[in-house]
């Protein structure tokens, strides 16, 4: 991260400012644990190992249970699998149209 910060300090600063605002426990409609659970699900979908570990720990620290983290993971997995199925439907449609 130091290399990125050195090469683009303003952008890195803006990114961390944005991240801090999103995960500020004193702002927003969603409580912090819910925001962290959403982050876990997104991290699983984007397959970011650092983000998965960081947000899972932060979710528990914010009050989420291990069961809630597991559920967020499974929701993300279902949506990711659903994307594969819908792409499969497109494949089937593309060959059906040519019949």
Feature roles, as predicted:
Residues 1-36, 87-99:
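Acidic, glycine/proline-rich low-complexity segments that act as flexible tails and inter-domain linkers
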Residues 23, 39, 56-60:
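Amphipathic alpha-helical segments within well-ordered protein domains
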Residues 38, 42-54:
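Short, thiol/selenol-centered motifs that function as redox-active sites or metal-ligating centers
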Residues 70-94:
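C-terminal structural segments of small proteins and small subunits
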Residues 33-43, 70-78:
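Alpha-helical scaffold segments that form or flank carboxylate-/histidine-based iron centers
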Residues 31-32, 49, 66:
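Alpha-helix N-cap/helix-initiation sites
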Residues 12-14, 53-68, 92-95:
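Iron-sulfur (Fe-S) cluster-binding segments and ferredoxin-like electron-carrier domains
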Residues 66-73, 99:
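Polybasic, low-complexity binding patches
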């Amino acid at each position: 991260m130091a290399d990125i910060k050195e090469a683009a300090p303003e952008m890195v600063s803006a990114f961390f400012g944005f991240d801090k605002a999103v995960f500020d426990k004193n702002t927003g409609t969603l409580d912090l644990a819910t925001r962290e659970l959403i982050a876990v699900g997104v991290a699983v979908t984007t397959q970011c190992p650092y983000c998965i570990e960081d947000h899972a720990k932060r979710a528990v620290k914010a009050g989420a249970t291990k069961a809630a983290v597991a559920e967020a993971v499974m929701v993300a997995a279902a949506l990711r699998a659903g994307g594969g199925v819908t792409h499969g439907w497109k494949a089937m449609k593309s060959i059906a149209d040519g019949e």
